[in-house]
């Protein structure tokens, strides 16, 4: 596995985590 694909995988994982956190915050704001 090359360094570039390694970086790309880490970037995708970080993007998904950050967006899921944002969605979770919005959902918790709406529910309250």
Swiss-Prot record:
Domain of life: Viruses
TM region(s), chain numbering: 4-24
Lipid bilayer topology: Single-pass membrane protein
Keyword terms, alphabetized: Host membrane, Membrane, Transmembrane, Transmembrane helix, Virion
A single cellular component GO annotation: membrane
Principal subcellular localisation of the protein: virion
Cellular compartment(s): Virion; Host membrane
Family of the protein in this entry: Belongs to the inovirus G9P protein family.
Record function comment: May initiate with G7P the virion concomitant assembly-budding process, by interacting with the packaging signal of the viral genome. The assembly-budding takes place at the host inner membrane. In turn, G7P and G9P are present at the end of the filamentous virion that emerges first from the bacterial host.
Protein's UniProt name: Tail virion protein G9P
């Amino acid at each position: 596995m090359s360094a570039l694909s390694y970086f790309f995988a880490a970037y995708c994982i970080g993007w998904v985590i950050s967006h899921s956190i944002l969605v979770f915050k919005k959902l918790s704001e709406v529910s309250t």
